[in-house]
């Protein structure tokens, strides 16, 4: 708490880049939510482009009103 779940198209990130990403995100969460470092968890899931529709349908579209940053694209047919 909080838990951040990042889903993105595949990227070539080495362990150092992943650690830097996690550190930057952690800093933002600490600053804005007044969380402790030890309470933050972050997942990075790389999703193939052809599978993104399932993410949209299950996680993005149903939560559109709750998103604090909405996507600048739509996958509605």
From Swiss-Prot:
Compartments reported by the entry: Cytoplasm
Cystine bridges: none
Record function comment: Can use enol isomers of phenylpyruvate, 2-hydroxy-2,4-pentadienoate and (p-hydroxyphenyl)pyruvate as substrates.
Presence of keyword Plastid: no
Domain of life from the UniProt record: Bacteria
Record-given protein name: Tautomerase PptA
Any GO MF annotation of the entry: protein homodimerization activity
GO cellular component, one term: cytoplasm
Assembly with partners or alone: Homodimer.
Native source species: Escherichia coli (strain K12)
Assigned EC number: 5.3.2.-
Modes of activity regulation: Inhibited by (E)-2-fluoro-p-hydroxycinnamate.
Entry-linked HAMAP family: Tautomerase_PptA
């Amino acid at each position: 708490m909080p838990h951040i779940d990042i889903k993105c198209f595949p990227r070539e990130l080495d362990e150092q880049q992943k650690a830097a990403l996690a550190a930057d995100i952690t800093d933002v969460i600490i600053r804005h939510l007044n969380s402790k470092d030890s309470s933050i968890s972050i997942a990075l899931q790389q999703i193939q482009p052809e599978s993104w529709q399932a993410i949209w349908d299950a996680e993005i579209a149903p939560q559109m009103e709750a998103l604090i940053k909405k996507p600048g694209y739509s996958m509605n047919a």
